[in-house]
């Protein structure tokens, strides 16, 4: 089939992973509902579904890397399509966080009588934005600079320097996550403390989840860079990770300014 191909696009071979991922998602959904309603076997089905999804993700991405690195299917046209696809994914993530910011500003700009007609709600002790939040902002911005350093190193063909930069990025990301967990532990309010607690923990919590995903993404890129699987002309995976990380940086800046600083006044 490859010999008769007269175009630069990758026609993927039949794969079992889409159907296995669908079955894992079904098991996770049904198991989650059963678990929340205390049905017997719900926790087991939920766990199996999550394991199935994680396994499918691992082997599917493994196959994509094989098609790219070992089989040479990722031509310039395919790489361009992957870039467009990831840009659309980031746009969908923007809409995702837009919903949380909408909920926050809807509640804070016109506080209802149920929360005392003021913002922050009456009885809520807010966090000082100039302590851990400001430190985390500096850490995350530094990690963004480090991933840009890694990108320039890859483009310059300096493989070891790119690995060092990615290690620095991952370490800064881990420090950020640790401080965020410390902040949650010390927070004087919980997710059930009025709309303030709900919007705070949902927005910052999902951002933290994205930081963890981005950290794993960068770890994989660092391993691939160490193994010599990325070149200055072929590093779409790293570009996607860098775009994702810069998106995480920008979201955090909006969170810091709106929720921590303005919303805590």
UniProtKB/Swiss-Prot annotation:
- The portions of this protein that span the membrane are 41-61, 85-105, 137-157, 162-182, 200-220, 245-265
Query: Do you know which InterPro entries this protein is assigned to?
Result: Cyt_c/ubiquinol_Oxase_su3, Cyt_c_oxase_su3_dom, Cyt_c_oxidase-like_su3, Cyt_c_oxidase_su3-like_sf, Cyt_c_oxidase_su3_a-hlx
Per the record, GO CC terms? mitochondrial inner membrane
**A Pfam family assignment:** COX3
Protein's recorded name: Cytochrome c oxidase subunit 3
Q: Which family does it belong to?
A: Belongs to the cytochrome c oxidase subunit 3 family.
**What chemistry does it catalyse, as a reaction equation?**
4 Fe(II)-[cytochrome c] + O2 + 8 H(+)(in) = 4 Fe(III)-[cytochrome c] + 2 H2O + 4 H(+)(out)
Subunit-structure text: Component of the cytochrome c oxidase (complex IV, CIV), a multisubunit enzyme composed of a catalytic core of 3 subunits and several supernumerary subunits. The complex exists as a monomer or a dimer and forms supercomplexes (SCs) in the inner mitochondrial membrane with ubiquinol-cytochrome c oxidoreductase (cytochrome b-c1 complex, complex III, CIII).
**Gene Ontology biological-process entries:** aerobic electron transport chain
**Membrane topology, record value:** Multi-pass membrane protein
Q: Where is the signal peptide?
A: none
Lineage, opening ranks: Eukaryota, Viridiplantae, Streptophyta, Embryophyta, Tracheophyta
Protein's gene: COX3
What GO annotations for molecular function exist for this entry? cytochrome-c oxidase activity
Could you tell me where this protein is found in the cell?
Mitochondrion inner membrane
């Amino acid at each position: 089939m490859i010999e008769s191909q007269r175009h630069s696009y990758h026609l993927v071979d039949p794969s079992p992973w889409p159907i296995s991922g669908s079955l894992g998602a079904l098991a996770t959904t049904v198991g989650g509902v059963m678990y929340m309603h205390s049905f017997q076997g719900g926790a087991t089905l939920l766990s199996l579904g999550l394991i199935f999804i994680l396994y499918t993700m691992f082997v599917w991405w493994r196959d994509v890397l094989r098609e790219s690195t070992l089989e040479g299917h990722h031509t310039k046209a395919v790489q361009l399509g992957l870039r467009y696809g990831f840009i659309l994914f980031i746009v969908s993530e923007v809409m995702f966080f837009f919903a949380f910011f909408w909920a926050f500003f809807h509640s804070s700009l016109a506080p209802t009588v149920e929360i005392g007609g003021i913002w922050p709600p009456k009885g809520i002790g807010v966090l000082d934005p100039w302590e851990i939040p400001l430190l985390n902002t500096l850490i995350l911005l530094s990690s963004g600079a480090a991933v840009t350093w890694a990108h320039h190193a890859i483009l310059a063909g300096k493989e070891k320097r790119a690995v060092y930069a990615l290690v620095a990025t991952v370490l800064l990301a881990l420090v950020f996550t640790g401080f965020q967990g410390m902040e949650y532990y010390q927070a004087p309010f919980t997710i059930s403390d009025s709309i303030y607690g709900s919007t705070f923990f949902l927005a910052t919590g999902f951002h933290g989840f994205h930081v963890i995903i981005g950290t794993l993404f960068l770890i994989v890129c660092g391993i691939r860079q160490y193994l010599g699987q990325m070149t200055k002309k072929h590093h779409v995976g790293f570009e996607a990770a860098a775009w994702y990380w810069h998106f995480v940086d920008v979201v955090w800046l909006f969170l810091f300014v709106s929720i921590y600083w303005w919303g805590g006044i």
